[in-house]
Amino acid sequence: MTADTSSGDAAVAGASAGAEIHWFGGRFWGVSESLVGTLTPRISGEPDLHVGHFYGSQEASDLSEPDYEGLPQGASTSTHMLAGAVAGIMEHCLMFPIDCVKTRMQSLQPEPAARYRNVMDALWRIMRTEGIWRPIRGLNITAVGAGPAHALYFACYERLKKVLSDIIHPGANSHLANGAAGCVATLLHDAAMNPTEVVKQRMQMYNSPYRSVLDCMRCVWQREGALAFYRSYTTQLTMNVPFQALHFMTYEYLQELLNPQRHYNPSSHMVSGALAGAIAAAATTPLDVCKTLLNTQESLAVDSVSRSGRHITGLGHAFRTVYRLGGLPAYFKGVQARVIYQMPSTAISWSVYEFFKYMITKHQHEKRRIQRDAEK
């Protein structure tokens, strides 16, 4: 689908199953009607408009569009949930092979065949020795969990960010509010995502004994009980609360520098998301290593610390086990893969989220404008 701008107006023609997105002057020009209806994205040369501000005549005000950051009028909670769900699914699906490598590189006592030099070496060897589909084993359960988890995550964050900002720093952005909103949103996200993480990481491990996702879920339930799906929840929160607080504060700070008007700007969302993800990922890698150990209950690690084969339980137990088996360097196993995963992952997540939030909000505005015109 292409946009015809020869007369100075942008029109979206035809309908397609996907979206063909063209970058021009930092703007998206084409978008599938199947996703958000017949839309006219803003093009370079159009005036930047804010919520509650209109320029020119009444006709110009009818054609104006709200700033997509205008939460009360511009984007409802359902908009944030829909945009967040799509962003979460795309983020996890596109980056899943790297996530598989990260899980394996965090193994404390890997088999000789599962010792990798770097991310690319790991990907190549996994596909060559275990099959081309092995790096995406467990993708289905991840996609199922990522949708609702990210819907809650972004909707909660956007709502609390505004409420807390109005309390802490009325009329302006507050980094403290951003961090606090990110922490609370993480509680909901991890509650929905933690069982998925347990199954996913067990499917990703080298020589995983499970035939399928359902087989893994049944075995974990029968052998370890229902609580096994939340064994790493406190560790996950201990890792993700500071991760998301740092992530959101860094993202919002970079947005103030790169996009001070807070308009829809794909390049600034991508750069801010990538840098925020990289910084937060590197800082919280030790906690991620412990979370992986708690989720996978890596057999060699468990056997080496307990002859009885007792499960590793709790963050303190995991920290002691990691140090006993590998010393301080073990806390940063897989840091390269984690940063490589998080940079594009958060860039994709924020870019897709902001894109859909912008387009859905614009579509809602267009519908309201058409309704007003019909009533005249």
Swiss-Prot record:
Q: Where in the cell is it found?
A: Mitochondrion inner membrane
Record has Calcium as a keyword: no
One Pfam family per UniProt: Mito_carr
- GO cellular component annotations, sorted alphabetically? mitochondrial inner membrane; mitochondrial membrane
Listed under catalytic activity are: Fe(2+)(in) = Fe(2+)(out)
**What molecular function terms (GO) are annotated for this protein?**
ferrous iron transmembrane transporter activity
Chief subcellular site? mitochondrion
From the UniProt record, list the Solcar repeat ranges.
75-163, 173-257, 264-359
Tell me how this protein sits in the membrane.
Multi-pass membrane protein
> Where expressed (tissue)?
Ubiquitous. Expressed at low levels throughout the whole embryo at 24 hpf.
Chain ranges passing through the membrane: 77-96, 138-157, 175-194, 232-251, 266-285, 334-353
Keyword list (alphabetical) reads: Ion transport, Iron, Iron transport, Membrane, Mitochondrion, Mitochondrion inner membrane, Repeat, Transmembrane, Transmembrane helix, Transport
Tagged with keyword Ribonucleoprotein:
no
PANTHER family in UniProt: MITOFERRIN-1-RELATED (PTHR45758), MITOFERRIN-2 (PTHR45758:SF20)
Its function, per the record, reads: Mitochondrial iron transporter that mediates iron uptake. Probably required for heme synthesis of hemoproteins and Fe-S cluster assembly in non-erythroid cells.
Family per record = Belongs to the mitochondrial carrier (TC 2.A.29) family.
Q: What is this protein called?
A: Mitoferrin-2
> What species was this sequence derived from?
Danio rerio (Zebrafish)
Its gene is slc25a28
